Each structure stands twice: as structure tokens, then as C-alpha cells.
Swiss-Prot record:
Pathway listed: Cofactor biosynthesis; ubiquinone biosynthesis
Keyword list, A-Z: Cytoplasm, Lyase, Pyruvate, Ubiquinone biosynthesis
Naturally occurring in which organism (per UniProt): Pectobacterium atrosepticum (strain SCRI 1043 / ATCC BAA-672) (Erwinia carotovora subsp. atroseptica)
Biological classification of the source: Bacteria, Pseudomonadati, Pseudomonadota, Gammaproteobacteria, Enterobacterales
Protein name from the UniProt record: Chorismate pyruvate-lyase
The family this protein is said to belong to: Belongs to the UbiC family.
Chain's gene name: ubiC
SUPFAM superfamilies: Chorismate lyase-like (SSF64288)
GO annotation, biological process: pyruvate biosynthetic process; ubiquinone biosynthetic process
Amino acid sequence: MSDDASTLLRTISWFTEPPSVLPEHIGDWLMETSSMTQRLEKYCAQLRVTLCREGFITPQMLGEERDQLPADERYWLREVVLYGDDRPWLFGRTIVPQQTLEGSGAALTKIGNQPLGRYLFEQKSLTRDYIHTGCCEGLWARRSRLCLSGHPLLLTELFLPESPVYYTPGDEGWQVI
């Protein structure tokens, strides 16, 4: 699944402004400015992270993501799947320039199976430069350039088919939008 999701991310057309065709319920999820981890936790008894890939990569391995970050010799890559009650909900890809990892940013390489949002949203120095939204094959995604103490990282989140982003509460339980 992680390879498929990672490949799919590379084919997404990104919008700098939310498109007019974006359903309101989905747009609310995509434009979430707080922790996506905390929002997802409201919809399940257990949120679990499976680490798919982690380690340093070269600038040549970034593709168009390179345009979203400052030039550096290497970047820390972390790819995960978040599961809500054992259902795959979100594929996350984080790219961190080596310079961001200096000082307190080094903790980003030691998160392991913990949700990134738990760490990031505890940091008082966290800011968000933007949220871009995108869609591919009926799946919605968002990417944000976040900064810790002024140093950037790129977080991309692909909402998988079983994610609550595609459901809305109805009279008879959750219904597909």
C-alpha cells in the first residue's frame, strides 16, 4: 500500500487555492489548521502509525517537491500509514531538509511509530506557510510547508478510501459522501 500511495502522490495535480468543486465536508478536512492526528483520533478508538520508510535521500529523489523546500545536500524522508481502528486512513510523507534537523529539529528523526502531529503541535515555534490541496483518482490530499523555529519541512497527506474524510454522519450512521 505505501508504494502505491507514494506513487500516487507523485501524480497529484496541486491547487494553491481550494478548487470550487471541492465538497464542503472534504474541504473542511483538507484546510484543517490544527493537528490532523487529533482530528482523526476523534473518529476511532485507536489511531496507530505504521512506519513504511525512513531515512536520508538525495535532492534528486525529490521530484517536484524540491521546489517547495530550500536546497540542501540531503533530506530526511519519513513515510507512514495512519490506521484508525485497523483501517488505513492516511498516507503521510514528510520531507525535512538536513538544515532543519540541526538543534532541536533532530528529534524529527527519532519519532518512530508516533504520529508526527503529536510532536509538531507541541512545539511553540511551529508555523504553517501554506496548505495546498490536490486530487488524484478520486482521493484527496493536502501538503503543507511547516516551519520549526523558522526552518521548513514539507508534510504531504493522502486521505485513503476508508478515511473519515469521505464520510459524513447521517441518520443511519456514517454515509459515503
